[in-house]
Amino acid sequence: MCVGVTLLAVLGALSRAYSGDPNEPLLLLSIPALVYFVRGQLYARQRVNGVRITAHQFPEAHRMVVEAARAFGMPRVPEAYVVLGNGVINAFASGHGSRRYVALNSDLFEVGGRLSDPDALRFFIGHEVGHIAAGHTSFWRQFGISVANVIPGVGSTLGRAQEYTADNHAYAFHPEGVQGMRVLAAGKYLYPEVDFDDIVDRARTDTGFFVTLVNLLSSHPVNTFRFAALADRGRPGRVL
């Protein structure tokens, strides 16, 4: 779908150029350069500010990254970094050139360390490495998403589909860690007290126009839909 969006964008730009509007196609066709710059700058930021996960530094986490890459049949193990989270629970995967990497905010990384829940950390690492294995971090995929974001709802829908795919990779890699997703709902200290199944059940009861709208405009599936997809492996996640 990203390839289709990219091709339509390029064809649209060329069409506008032939119709006598030179400014808009030039702006659109400059997006690849912007995406390249942003990817390079983001990668450099992790390298100079983050803590590299290696066999000697955070060896348990490094082993998780290596095992996830092997489980997904990846030819190269991606780099991995811990970055200062300042209270934000987040992680992401990206790349620059031929290099691929994952970055985990320190607040999320602590779940597997100081809070002693390695299953949860293994699941999150599986999710991020899954993004790379699924091709979500390629230059043209991210370019396609950038173009799709111009159309309200389209880019975010592609993003949600990718998140479900990465969740599927994480579940295949380490299903025992699925309960760690509660961190996304209540944070790193309260999540052990959260009832996972209650959030799953609310996917059926908490519905309506505004719930659909919130999900439509979100780059990630809302928690109720996402938890429900992880609980019922026989159904695909709800994108819309």
Please identify what each model-predicted range represents.
Residues V65, L104, H127, A166, ...:
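Divalent metal-coordination and catalytic microenvironments
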